[in-house]
Every structure is written in structure tokens, then in C-alpha cells.
Amino acid sequence: MSSSIVVIAAGERSTEAVLAAEALRRAATAAGRSVTIEIRSDQGVLGALPTELTNGAAHVLIVGDADADTARFGDAQLLHLSLGAVLDDPAAAVSQLAATTAPASTSATTDASGAGGKRIVAITSCPTGIAHTFMAAEGLQQAAKKLGYQMRVETQGSVGAQDALTDEEIRAADVVIIAADREVDLARFGGKRLFKSGTKPAINDGPALIQKALAEAGVHGGAAPVAGANATSDAKGNARTGAYKHLMTGVSFMLPFVTAGGLLIALAFALGGIYAGDDAHQGTLAWSLFQIGAKAGFTLMVPALAGYIAYSIADRPGIAPGMIGGLVAANLNAGFLGGIIAGFIAGYGVAALNRYIKLPRNLEGLKPVLILPVLGTLLVGLAMMYVFGQPVADLLAWLTAWLRGMQGSSALLLGLLLGGMMAFDMGGPVNKAAYAFSTGLIASQVYTPMAAAMVAGMTPPLGIALATWVFRNRFTVEERGSATAAGVLGLAFVTEGAIPYAARDPLRTIPALVIGSAVAGAISMTAGAELKAPHGGIFVLLIPNAVTHLLNYVLALVVGVVVTAVALRLLKKPVADVIA
């Protein structure tokens, strides 16, 4: 397979750089070529090219107009393309590179799959499965090439698994790396050396993560795991896990139920009015949509949340007790709070049972299919029925009544709080805490916090985009060039689009973003806007009845964006040599 060198000099456009790298890699694979890609941005260098590779390079593709340090390539032939050209047609970029590359140029690089290299497989995943999933995959792939190892990465994103690992690749691997912020299924890796980490180490320092994995990985699940009986990985201690990660796993699996149920209910109301679910309309399309959304989709929300919290803690044996406990919580009107408690009781309870119940080897197979599900379900079911169910139901009823009765200053304060949290760390723990709280309340038919959270999450990238267009002297050329991409991400409710700007000047940028998002959230809550879907950004506004008080909701977004832009103008200093 022919191999080529690519340097993406992105400046502030780090998000577009990662997308361009992935597009080039896929296009090169389709064309029967391999590419070694280095990404250079204001956040650092990802996948730095080793000296022996740069010294022997004959042809190099330079993407972008920032500094690519081309002096290190000596007399190599350089082909320059813009980021936009590569994103628009990566196949054409690969073809242009191939046309300038002599047949002998393949000797300039050494394929990481050579006989002397380690074989590594990895899985990357994050709670929402959008940004960090693919950035972590990119970091691992670049790091493996730098170290001379063969790397295959399976991404478990929002649309499911991509580039799935084969059984042959897993068998041949020297180590398995799980770079994920939520739990993933490890059943395939029984008997393999396995190392678990979050996505951030893979993004920030892939080579160090790979070296640590090779040195510290432990054998997962024994040589032949029995249907998840030994579900708790010995490698689990390699990375810090905790309640937050388990909760985010549950939320991640719950979101599709919330989205499907909420939008189908909104469509039912659009077709048949607010009484579409009444028996008087039985047999109509609107009534059917309401039954599917409310009686099926929403009914499974809390069991899915609880089941996958338990799965994150205890692996497969925890799913059945968790889901049953979640359904018990829902039937007791304990809602998402009860589901969270049921999930943790089931997860930690099953994990403890699995650890302390010892059976003869020939009876070990009974644990995952009989003993753990029955005892785990008994534990969580009785705990919810007699201990936690009613108190949590009373607490949720009070919280629901309080939220529904919010007016004036109370709604304003909650909107300010949720909005500020959404912008504080843009996809981090504080952001996810506000998002999980708002999403969970949908199960109790409380939709105003969800509306506030989404409008606040859209505000930072859109506010930055507006500021780069209006207050040009506060931003570099590279920052202004990536503003369109940030704006598109904002429209899609991907708050992470603002991260490159915040990383460059956090002390001035983050306060401006928090102010704008807090204002947007406060206006949304005060206006009583409701949102029945947990995601979708500006595009969900096109669905009838998905958002109430639509004009006020759009006003909240516009005001929040403008406030963000003005705050950036006031807080950021002019950039030298930039004309407004």
C-alpha cells in the first residue's frame, strides 16, 4: 500500500483539522494508499512526524495556511491545499497527492503494520458520541504511527459502531485500549491484555497513553469468560471510574428513548391537538403516534437509564436487575431520580454478589443466567418497594410541582444556573450534570429546563461566530476563518465548537460565554418555553409542537448570542496587527 505524508496546519481551526484528517484517511484507504498525518494547531501538535520520516520525505501534502514548519522537509516536493478544499473533496486531494508521488516514494515511510511493530486495537466513545469520540480515535492513530505500531480503532459514536474490530484483529492484538467516558461492552476481549482510560489522555498525549497501556494492561476476564460471569474487568483499576461515569453511561443509552418518544408525542399533538391521546381519538394516526411515543418510548426511558447505569458498574449481569428496578421506580412514580437510585443499587449489588458468591467451576455458568439476575432483581426490587420508592416519589412530586409553578425570580434563577453550567466547561462534567438533570425531567413531563439547557448550549459557538464577524479586531485570521464551522456546530447544539476559542484565552472567553448562556437560559425559563426533545438544535424547531412559545424561545437564543458577542468585545483585548 502506497504511503504519503500530510501536514494539516490548522491554527485555530482544530475541529476542522480533525475532520479533514479523518476524511483524508478514509479517502486514502479507499484509493489503496496510507497516509501519515500530523495536525498542527494552536492547541499543540497531534501525531508529530518522527525525524527519520521528515528527513526522508520526497512528497508532502500541506493542508491549511498556518505554519507547517516546512523547513524540516528539505528538498521534498510540497503540495499545498486549503482546509476547505480537502473537506469538500478529500478524494480529489488524495488523487492530487498520488499524481505528484513517484512510485519509489513508498520507501519514504515505514508502514506501522511492519513485522516489528506492536499490534494494538482500541475503542473510543463518549456520552454523546460526537466530538471526543473521534478526536480520541485520531489521537491514538497518530500516536501509533509515531511509535511504529499497528493500530485499529473502533469508534462507538452517536450513530453506532464504525470501523468495527474483527475477531482476527482482536486475536492478533498485543493489547486492547478502551479510551471511553462511558462503559463499553468488553465481552469480545476475554483473555486479552486490556487497559481502560478516558478520552482526554488519548486526545492530549496519545503516545504516553499507548506506552502506559503496554506497560500496565491487565488480562481481562480470564481465558474463556462464561457469558459475562466474570464481568468485572481486572483492568478496571487502570482508570478512575466513579458515579459520574456510570451515570453518563445510563444517560447516553436513555437519550434515544427520550428523543423518539418526545418527537412522536409532538407530532401527535401537531396532527390531533393536545387531546390526541384520549380514547375518543382511538384508531387515528395521532392517537397511534401518542401511544408509541408516550406509552412505549417514554415508558422505557427510566428502565433504560437504570439498566445501563447497572451495566456500567456490573457489566451484563447488571442489566436485568437494573432495568427491572427502573421499571419498579417508574411504576412507583419515582421517575428518573428513582431510576438513578435503582441503577446504582442494582449495579453495586450485582457486582458485590458476583465478587463474593463462589461456586464450583462446573456451576459457575449459573451465575450470569440465574443467580445474579434473580438475587440482584430481588435486592433492587425490595429496596425500591420498601425503602427508597415512596420517599423518592414524594421528592420528585415536590420538585415537579415546584418547577411547574416557577414564575418570576425563581424561574429566572434556575435559568441563569442551568445556562451558566452549560457554558462553563462545554461538554465537561458541569455541562453534563445540567444536561442530565434537564433530560431526566422529561420523564416527569417537565420540559422547561430542557429548553433552557439546549438554548444555553447553542449560545457559545453562535456567540463566538457572531463576535468574529462583528468585532474582527478581537480575533486572529485563523479564528475568523473557523467561525463558520463554529456557527454550524452551535446550530446543531454541539457546544464543543467553542472549545478552541476558549482554550486560547480562557480567562476572558469563558466568562463571556457563561454570561451569554445564562441570559439565554433565564429568558427561556421566564418565558415558559418547553422542549420535548433532548437534542437537535435549531433543526428541532421545525417540528410542530416540539417547542412551545417558539418566538420567545428564538428571542432567548438571539439575545443570548448577542450578549455573548458583546461580552467578548468587552473582555477580549484587540489582536495586534489585525484591522477591524
From Swiss-Prot:
Q: Does the keyword Transmembrane apply?
A: yes
Q: What does this protein do?
A: The phosphoenolpyruvate-dependent sugar phosphotransferase system (sugar PTS), a major carbohydrate active transport system, catalyzes the phosphorylation of incoming sugar substrates concomitantly with their translocation across the cell membrane. The enzyme II FruAB PTS system is involved in fructose transport.
Q: Could you tell me which residue ranges the PTS EIIC type-2 domain spans?
A: 243-580
Entry membrane topology: Multi-pass membrane protein
Q: Give the EC number.
A: 2.7.1.202
Q: Where is the PTS EIIB type-2 domain?
A: 1-99, 120-215
Task: Tell me one GO molecular function of this protein.
Answer: kinase activity
Specify where it is mainly localized: membrane
Catalytic EC class = transferase
The record's listing under Gene3D superfamilies reads: 3.40.50.2300
Up-regulation conditions: By fructose.
Which Pfam families does this UniProt record tie to the protein? PTS_IIB (PF02302)
| The name this protein goes by in its record | PTS system fructose-specific EIIB'BC component
Null-mutant phenotype, please? Cells lacking this gene grow normally on glucose but are unable to grow on fructose.
UniProt domain comment: The PTS EIIB type-2 domain is phosphorylated by phospho-EIIA on a cysteinyl residue. Then, it transfers the phosphoryl group to the sugar substrate concomitantly with the sugar uptake processed by the PTS EIIC type-2 domain. In the N-terminal, the PTS system fructose-specific possesses a duplicated EIIB domain (EIIB' domain) which lacks the active site and functions to facilitate phosphoryl transfer between the EIIA domain of diphosphoryl transfer protein (DTP) and the EIIB domain. The presence of the EIIB' domain is required for normal high affinity recognition of DTP by the PTS system fructose-specific as well as for normal rates of phosphoryl transfer between the EIIA and EIIB domains of DTP and PTS system fructose-specific, respectively.
The protein's annotated catalytic reaction(s) are: D-fructose(out) + N(pros)-phospho-L-histidyl-[protein] = D-fructose 1-phosphate(in) + L-histidyl-[protein]
Ordered alphabetically, the record's keywords are: Cell inner membrane, Cell membrane, Kinase, Membrane, Phosphoprotein, Phosphotransferase system, Repeat, Sugar transport, Transferase, Transmembrane, Transmembrane helix, Transport
| GO (cellular component) term, any one | plasma membrane
Recorded hits in PROSITE patterns, A to Z, give: PTS_EIIB_TYPE_2, PTS_EIIC_TYPE_2
